[in-house]
Amino acid sequence: MILELDCGNSFIKWRVLRAEAGALIAEGVVDSDGALVDNLRSLEKVSLVKCRLVSVRTEDETNLLIGLLKQEFGISVVCAAPAREMSGVKNGYDDYERLGLDRWLAMLGGFHLAKGACLVLDFGTAVTADFISADGEHLGGFICPGMPLMRNQLRTHTRKIRYGDLAAERALTSQAPGRNTVEAVERGCSLMLRGFVLTQLEMARSYWGDDYRVFITGGDAELVSDVAPEARVVSDLVFVGLAMACPLS
């Protein structure tokens, strides 16, 4: 069985696949290496053989996790690496190694699914947008703070803004002007993300008219999915690209 990991800034997304058919056996999201090991050990009748992962962590943090996986499960680990070109997609950064690996894999996955021009929007700790033309040319992209960063900055630097995650979730049941601080903050941040999406769609149309696909991924994808009804929400888009970048026989 194959373990796949997407090690982000705040969480580790994991899933276990059956090696022969690629069928999904189990999946989850954890906030630490220890929690990952606990989750995997709790699975019944699961025998891990190989692992492929993508990480935006520091090299030391990634190596610690790899060492832990080898120690606990005795499996080989393959890491996604930067590339100038792969699977028909040409990296658009001047220094290709500086492009975040999660963005790169999401682009590979999006282009593979689109079979043509596409806009890839990822809503995690940070929000990213990337434009890939029909011939696979990465035209560049944008990065801005995601919902967690905007929320935490306001909580940290504004003394009177204090509320919990449950209050934040309740506040997002509407987009009407807030009648209290939590509603005002959460809905204001949400509207910023929605405005970001609309700007990206406008730019994509200026490039390709209506001849392109839109993919939305990331933990907060559902907050903006209604802004782009034509978009396809693909929660595992990074994993689609990971399988392309790190094929395991």
Curated annotation (Swiss-Prot):
Its cofactor is NH4(+); K(+). Its EC number is 2.7.1.33. It catalyses: (R)-pantothenate + ATP = (R)-4'-phosphopantothenate + ADP + H(+). A monovalent cation. Ammonium or potassium. Pathway: Cofactor biosynthesis; coenzyme A biosynthesis; CoA from (R)-pantothenate: step 1/5. One of its GO terms (molecular function) is pantothenate kinase activity. Keywords: ATP-binding, Coenzyme A biosynthesis, Cytoplasm, Kinase, Metal-binding, Nucleotide-binding, Potassium, Transferase. CDD domains: ASKHA_NBD_PanK-III (cd24015). K(+) binds at D122. GO terms for cellular component: cytoplasm. HAMAP family: Pantothen_kinase_3. Catalyzes the phosphorylation of pantothenate (Pan), the first step in CoA biosynthesis. This is Type III pantothenate kinase. It comes from Pseudomonas fluorescens (strain Pf0-1). The lineage of its organism: Bacteria, Pseudomonadati, Pseudomonadota, Gammaproteobacteria, Pseudomonadales.
